Amino acid sequence: MTWQNDYSRDYEVKNHMECQNRSDKYIWSPHDAYFYKGLSELIVDIDRLIYLSLEKIRKDFVFINLNTDSLTEFINRDNEWLSAVKGKQVVLIAARKSEALANYWYYNSNIRGVVYAGLSRDIRKELAYVINGRFLRKDIKKDKITDREMEIIRMMAQGMLPKSIARIENCSVKTVYTHRRNAEAKLYSKLYKLVQ
């Protein structure tokens, strides 16, 4: 009986993920079925708080889960995923450790807004606020990663050592360590833990 339940559950999860990978889906990451289900239900739940129809949201918006499990992929491929969502209204859902990166992408690309999941007293209102287009630069609640820090984060995510990074960036190894330390303070974590 347990084997059949496990098999059934695996089939259900696999089927759900395949559905999420279709181009008409508006929630990333395809690997997080709980996030997908929870956010889908939350968007339907806040229907009365938003100005747009649910159909327009499904068509024009992309909601991206920036959690610690997916950060490496987003860091290594930020140009790719930003290109893939071009023309869409992108909403980043940021966990505490990814807030500074979310702010970086908000400032440096065409992101509609950021929902800070860790700070939110009422995530429904925050989500509606962003969907309705009211999120502005003044709403940024935390520091953002600088361009130099982001370059160092990218290189470290690729497995490069500080000495190699210093050579490429034409700076001292001490400067690399300083930028890394500053980024870690903004991300509330050691970089090696985030970019494994």
Swiss-Prot record:
GO cellular component, one term: cytoplasm
Pfam families found in the cross-reference section: GerE
Disulfide bonds: none
Its biological purpose: Part of the ecpRABCDE operon, which encodes the E.coli common pilus (ECP). ECP is found in both commensal and pathogenic strains and plays a dual role in early-stage biofilm development and host cell recognition. Positively regulates the expression of the ecp operon.
SUPFAM superfamilies reported in the protein's UniProt record: C-terminal effector domain of the bipartite response regulators
Keyword Transcription: yes
Keyword DNA-binding part of the UniProt annotation: yes
Similarity remark: Belongs to the EcpR/MatA family.
Induction of expression: Negatively regulated by H-NS. Positively autoregulated. Also positively regulated by IHF.
PROSITE patterns per record: HTH_LUXR_2
Residues annotated to bind DNA: 162-181
Subcellular location: Cytoplasm
Biological process according to GO: regulation of DNA-templated transcription
GO MF annotations in UniProt: DNA binding
Signal peptide as annotated in the record: none
Domain HTH luxR-type: 138-196
UniProt keyword annotations, A-Z: Activator, Cytoplasm, DNA-binding, Transcription, Transcription regulation
Species name: Escherichia coli O81 (strain ED1a)
Main location: cytoplasm
Protein name in UniProt: HTH-type transcriptional regulator EcpR
